[in-house]
Amino acid sequence: MLFRSDEVQTGFARTGKMFAIENYDVEPDIMTMAKALGNGAPISCFISRSEIADKYTRPGASTLGGNPVSSTAGIAVLDYIEEHNLVEKSRVRGKQLKDGLIALQEKYPFIGDVRGLGLMVGAELINPDKSPAPDKLEFVVETMKDRGFLIGKNGIARNVLAFQPPLVISEENINDLLNNLDDVMSQVK
């Protein structure tokens, strides 16, 4: 059985490792990647074990394959990640963000599970009976947006605050986010 790791959202330093799968004790046969590789330029790729790649011998064609501009952007992104140590920065800033959310969780009982790796973190908002609280999430997201912070909505019930800030985010940026989030959460009814 083949195991494929989809790194479209989680790859390229997002989780405090170059690829999210590196946080676990498994090795995929195939990895698919996109989005962050181009930092806005349209590009995707896949890699595989050599025994799989060696079986791919038929010629193929792709309308969008081999684009030199996107390929150049991908190389520049990889260079930037390495030169600016963004894997480690994601781990450190992600810990700061997650620790800050856990501190808020102790203050606000409507924050349920806080989870994530690196700079891919979620905080679940719940009602007193532990049911999802999408209404609370809507208030928090919209009020934070009015303050200049974009926070995603996630989860089946749309009750999970989804934090995926830029990998270049600073300690001060995260402190500002957490301070504003604290103030907004103090207004949740």
Mark where each language-model region is:
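Conserved N-terminal phosphate-binding loop of PLP-dependent enzymes in the Aspartate aminotransferase
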Residues: 1-189
